[in-house]
Amino acid sequence: MNDSGEVRSTGSVFFDAVHYMLHQCNKSSHPFLRYLSRIHRFHHLYFTRHLKFDKKYIQQNRFQALPLELVLQIIGTVLGYIFARLVAPKGVFWVTRNHLWITIIFQILRTTFVILSSGRDTNHTTYQTPPEDTNWLFVGPEFHSLHHIYPDRYMGSFVKAFDWIWGTAYTFKGKRIAITGGNGAFGQAIVKKLDREERGSCIRKLKFGTDWDHHHFEKALPVLSNSDILILAHGSKGADAVESNCNAAIRLIKLFKEHRVANPACPTLPEVWYVGSEIELHPAWGNKELQRNSRSKRMFLPQARSFFDDPDIIYRHIVPSAFHSPMGAAALSADWAAKCAIWWIRRGARYIPVTYTGIAWLNYFKFMYRIPYAKDMDQM
């Protein structure tokens, strides 16, 4: 990244912080802050949470909201310039006033063009459902459209640093959740954590033997069809490990994709969270139960890799270190594992290392670059 890009990136973080404050100031005791918040609200009234343009607010957006945004961008850029000058090593990254002026001129020209284009730009695209955002660093229309659906989240304007820091790259608001293994150690912990994150959220447990088994899933369909997130937290180290950890998981995901009904309160892609294990990478050390568990988890990996790149769902692969549960003792609790997983998800992660050993970090490279895509996805 060149020096002007460094100024813009740093300035973006300052702008995003002010942007976040605008969304918090609509009920401020200070009239001026409420006034600024109201002006910015015109932008959201113009490009609505349904990702449509409302022409009724076109003039307020062009001549009030966009000029305010430009002023705040310039202030953020100046602050970013000051910060970059303070931290940039002399002789390595020179950040000069020329870089500052280049960035400001670019912002003025860009905003002028957007105003002349009736307030439309590449970050404001009409979607029925926002597609999956595959860029981990820079903000594009996929990410920014989520901000218009959930105005208090997804604050990034150029880079996603603010959302990483504050955990605003995700929300559970309005999402219906189904979970298998909800009575297990991790399942109970994640349900408890989700209840705290979003009080009143709809979390339904799919019970093994009642709602589904390894070969029968019909009773699970009503829940699957009315869910936005499917969490697969069940697991087995017994003789049925492959059926449970691999084959049944694949079947549940495919049924979820096939039968899920769109939720007007949550116009985003459906999500699948699969709870894997660091045993995907490290050896099983001769224990028969661990060998069965390792084999079943590794058999699922090609399917997981295919789901990870599936444009129709957001697939999150959770890779925890061993945690204390009825399946075995460990140093840390399931509550810690659940809290760590949610911390990562709040920051938009899709590969989620829940680790105190570091193995899950190494497993990331295996998962992304060594695991082949499944060849039999349509035959399962």
Question: Model-derived features: where do they sit?
Answer:
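Membrane-embedded catalytic scaffold of the fatty acid hydroxylase/desaturase
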Residues: 7-174
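N-terminal Rossmann NAD(P)H-binding glycine-rich loop of SDR-like oxidoreductase domains
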Residues: 177-196
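Structural signature of the Rossmann-like NAD(P)-dependent dehydrogenase/reductase core
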Residues: 180, 231-233, 268-277, 314-319
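Short-chain dehydrogenase/reductase
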Residues: 180, 242-246, 288-302, 330-335
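Conserved mid-core alpha-helix of short-chain dehydrogenase/reductase
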Residues: 215, 243, 247-258
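NAD(P)H-binding glycine-rich loop region in Rossmannoid oxidoreductase-like domains
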Residues: 217-247
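Catalytic loop of short-chain dehydrogenase/reductase
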Residues: 254-257, 261-312, 324-325
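C-terminal helical subdomain
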Residues: 317-318, 325-379
